[in-house]
């Protein structure tokens, strides 16, 4: 019985550690979003958050909205706590309802990978380092639907590599994080609530050479050209009550 209790406490501690790591990541992104919205950084309103197991990996989603009156900045954030088995081209997007307008060309995105790299240095020592690669996605590289209600980015999930040589270079990818951000405003003074939606589409099989159609509105998801069962999706909704 004591052993069972000990294992149970151990599981609780592990979950708490994962939650703390997730919170630190979200706080880091929140700081970046707030920096972009410095003049309007009055109130930060997070969504409840959503998590799921996709293709052997653990994915977290959350939406952060920073408001000042009826103007705001909003970021949809994803985090792969553990990466999925199959890694190809994924997509992540953020959309809004029709009660709001986007500040022209304010949208942007960013994603990053953390990994360990092992190699032989100039002193002929075999070392392992922790690194992070960060990629910015400017406005003109984002995808958007025909009505401009949503913005999304496509990116590849990295594959780890192990050297066949005893002291060759090996790379082990650990996690991935990213966000899509834009600035907006509420159109009508009579509006009392606003919805935003974040959607992650993970390609889990390479059988179809299919892709995602971003030309159609994706209020609650993307349009998959064909073989949509080859994609796994996770969504999050943010309700802002004014």
Task: Report the location of each language-model feature.
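Intrinsically disordered, low-complexity regulatory regions of eukaryotic regulatory proteins
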Residues: 40, 131-134, 211
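Generic structural motif
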Residues: 64-68, 79-83, 97-99, 162, ...
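Short N-terminal edge-element motif at the start of the domain
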Residues: 14-119
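Short, low-complexity, Pro/Ser/Thr/Gly-rich segments in the mature regions of secreted, periplasmic
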Residues: 228-242
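Intrinsic disorder/low-complexity segments
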Residues: 22, 36-39, 153, 157, ...
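Short helix-loop boundary/capping segments
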Residues: 94-195
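Single conserved hydrophobic/aromatic residue that forms the stacking wall/gate
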Residues: 2-13
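Glycine- and small hydrophobic-rich membrane-insertion segments that are intrinsically disordered
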Residues: 149-151, 155, 159, 194, ...
């Amino acid at each position: 019985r004591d052993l069972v209790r000990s294992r149970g406490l151990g599981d609780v501690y592990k979950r708490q550690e994962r939650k703390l790591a997730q919170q630190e990541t979200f706080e880091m992104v929140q700081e970046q979003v707030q920096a972009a919205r410095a003049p309007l950084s009055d109130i930060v309103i997070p969504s409840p958050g959503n998590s799921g197991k996709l293709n052997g990996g653990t994915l977290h989603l959350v939406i952060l909205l920073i408001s000042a009156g009826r103007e705001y900045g909003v970021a949809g954030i994803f985090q792969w706590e553990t990466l999925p088995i199959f890694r190809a081209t994924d997509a992540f997007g953020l959309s809004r309802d029709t009660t709001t307008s986007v500040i022209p060309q304010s949208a942007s995105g960013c994603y990053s990978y953390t990994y360990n790299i092992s190699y032989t240095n100039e002193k002929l020592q075999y070392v392992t380092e922790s690194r992070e690669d960060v990629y910015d996605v400017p406005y003109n590289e984002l995808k958007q639907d025909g009505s401009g209600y949503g913005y999304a980015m496509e990116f590849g999930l990295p594959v780890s590599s192990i050297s066949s040589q005893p002291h060759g270079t090996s790379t082990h990818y650990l996690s991935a994080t990213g966000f899509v951000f834009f600035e907006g405003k509420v159109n009508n003074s009579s509006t009392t609530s606003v919805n935003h939606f974040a959607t992650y589409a993970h390609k889990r099989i390479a059988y179809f050479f299919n892709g995602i159609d971003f030309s159609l509105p994706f209020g609650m998801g993307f349009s998959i050209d064909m073989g949509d069962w080859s994609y796994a999706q996770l969504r999050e909704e943010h309700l802002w009550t004014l």
